[in-house]
Curated annotation (Swiss-Prot):
Its EC number is 2.1.1.193. It catalyses: uridine(1498) in 16S rRNA + S-adenosyl-L-methionine = N(3)-methyluridine(1498) in 16S rRNA + S-adenosyl-L-homocysteine + H(+). It is found in: Cytoplasm. GO terms for molecular function: rRNA (uridine-N3-)-methyltransferase activity. Homodimer. The keyword Nucleotide-binding does not apply. Belongs to the RNA methyltransferase RsmE family. InterPro entries: Alpha/beta_knot_MTases, PUA-like_sf, RsmE, RsmE_MTase_dom, RsmE_PUA-like, tRNA_m1G_MTases_N. This is Ribosomal RNA small subunit methyltransferase E. Coiled coil: none annotated. It comes from Buchnera aphidicola subsp. Acyrthosiphon pisum (strain APS) (Acyrthosiphon pisum symbiotic bacterium). The keyword Cytoplasm applies. Pfam families: Methyltrans_RNA, PUA_4.
């Protein structure tokens, strides 16, 4: 049996399991996890895994059997580990090109965003082509799990079904603070003086916002704020905005 000291002194690979877990129980890994453990990590019988399952707990498990088709593990330790920020950031990200959108999802999760809704305008190219979002959502969810595995988050942020920007604004008429980041705004982050626990933010895609779009979003109660004097790429803007908010109101203090 591995001691707590042995666990602390060794970097233990993390995997995500959807199942409800309990101590001293046996589980079989999914095909995806089996491939990752055997082909990527090259793990063997008796090696230890750290498991997260979308709760505030992590489990340690020992590999007890490996074959071509199965990996059997047994849990032996459970630890409460809450790394979630007290600031709930809901990112409304206007969908950008594939690799940029992937980057935005990955990095925003690593720095603490809790909910992501991909957004689009009616005249966007993929909307005209009536692209089925199901495959994109599956890809984004995998990116979210991978980001959590890397950064030690145990609660996987929600990636919601893509929505029209204005429908999203209309459906989120609550008491949350709302911000749209725009390089031509005269307001800066310094205008946010009161404590914030829940906030919704909109980040544009590569094309930015047309003036009529910008004005309509403001009418839904979104405060226009700029992120410094420079114009940022869409994937940079999301990281900068979330980092600034985490520094002011979250767990980057």
């Amino acid at each position: 049996m591995f001691t707590s000291t042995a666990i602390k002194n060794k970097k233990i690979p993390r995997i995500y399991i959807e199942d409800d877990l309990d101590l001293n129980q046996f589980y079989f890994l999914s095909d995806e996890n089996r491939h990752y453990v055997t082909k990527v990590l090259r793990m063997k019988i008796e090696d230890i895994l750290e498991i997260f399952n979308n709760t505030h707990y992590i489990f340690f498990a020992k590999i007890i059997d490996i074959s071509k088709k199965i990996i059997k593990i047994q849990t032996f330790k459970k630890i409460l580990k809450n790394l979630e920020s007290p600031l709930h950031i809901h990112l409304g990200q206007v969908i950008s090109k594939n690799e940029k959108m992937d980057f935005t999802i990955q990095k925003s999760i690593e720095i603490g965003v809790k909910t992501i809704t991909p957004l689009f305008f009616e005249n966007d190219h993929f909307q005209k082509k009536r692209i089925n979002f199901s495959n994109k959502i599956k890809r984004w969810e995998k990116i979210a799990i991978s980001a959590c595995r890397q950064c030690n988050r145990n609660i996987i942020p929600k990636i919601k079904i893509p929505m029209n920007v204005f429908h999203w604004c209309e459906n989120n008429q609550n008491n949350d603070k709302k911000i749209i980041f725009h390089p031509k705004s005269t307001l800066t982050m310094k205008c946010l003086t009161e404590p914030i626990k829940y906030i919704q933010i909109i980040i544009g895609s590569e094309r930015g916002f047309f003036n009529d779009e910008f004005q309509k979003i403001i009418k839904y109660g979104f405060i226009p704020i700029r992120l410094g004097p420079r114009i940022l790429r869409t994937e940079t803007a999301s990281v900068v905005a979330i980092t600034a908010l985490q520094t002011m109101f979250g767990d980057f203090k």
